[in-house]
Amino acid sequence: MIAAALILFALGLVVGSFLNVCIYRLPREESIAWPASHCTTCNRTLRWYENVPVFSWVFLRGRCATCKSRISARYPIVELITGALFLGGYFAFGLTPLLGVRLLFACAMVVLFAIDLEHQILPNEITLTGIVIGFLCSLALPPGWISSLIGILIGGLFPFLIAEAYLRIRGHEGMGMGDFKMLAMVGAFLGWPLVWVTLIVSCILGIVIGGSVLLVSRRGMGTRIPFGTFIAVAALAAAYAAGPMRQAYERAVQAYLTWAGLA
């Protein structure tokens, strides 16, 4: 058990290194396969020992060995987070086929979080492809294809209707098309109950964190908040703690129905 956990954590670090490549290159419409990893300032190809996850960044003290330009701390952070997600996935799902699907989903959320945070875009290469992959996986694994299909419709259509109403009332967008596609992808992988949970939790995070940032920075209400970051966090929580979060959602709905005299 310990050996399997350590292997998965190490694998997560390696995968995290690749995710960093995706995070940097996808917004710039560059190939994620070629050229080999290189310094983005002096373009020198990295040696193998400069590509070891986390340790290379620490060894190089966060700077290129040749031009001494700074290497973003995002690189080891993404690698450590991915390693932790792989480790957590092992304890949550065991060595099962579902583990592979959940880890693929987690990797997509990490990349979307980082890209949306920095560039405020959610690449179709991930969201649209993720919708297809999530639905195909649901044909053989949880949540099942019916729940997945409903999740796609709820994740993509319901927020779109809310955003359209917001646009007509306020005169500017509250959510972008990328957010709808990302939520549809969440629905494809996790099914309709958990896409509801994801939507609710992400909205709460957006109000609390986004509102706090706007208040502290004193920016106008027209400032765009990268909502995809909140979706990613909420979706990962839903994926890894599906049982407790679904139960909490059902209790909240039941409490509301009781309060409203409908149950």
Regions found by a protein language model. Give the residues of each.
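Long, highly hydrophobic alpha-helical transmembrane signal-anchor segments
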Residues: M1-P27, L122-N124
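Alpha-helical membrane-inserting segments
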Residues: L19, I23, L85, G89, ...
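Conserved post-catalytic alpha-helical subdomain immediately downstream of the catalytic base
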Residues: P193-T223
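Functional transmembrane core segments of multi-pass inner-membrane proteins
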Residues: L8, L98-L99, L104-L205, A248-A263
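Select subsegments of transmembrane alpha-helices in polytopic membrane proteins
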Residues: A73-L80, N124
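C-terminal ends of transmembrane helices
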Residues: N20-L26, R61-S69, M109-I121, L161-E173, ...
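Interfacial loop-to-transmembrane junctions
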Residues: G176-G178, G211-A237
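Membrane-proximal soluble regions of multi-pass membrane proteins
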Residues: L19-R74, F227
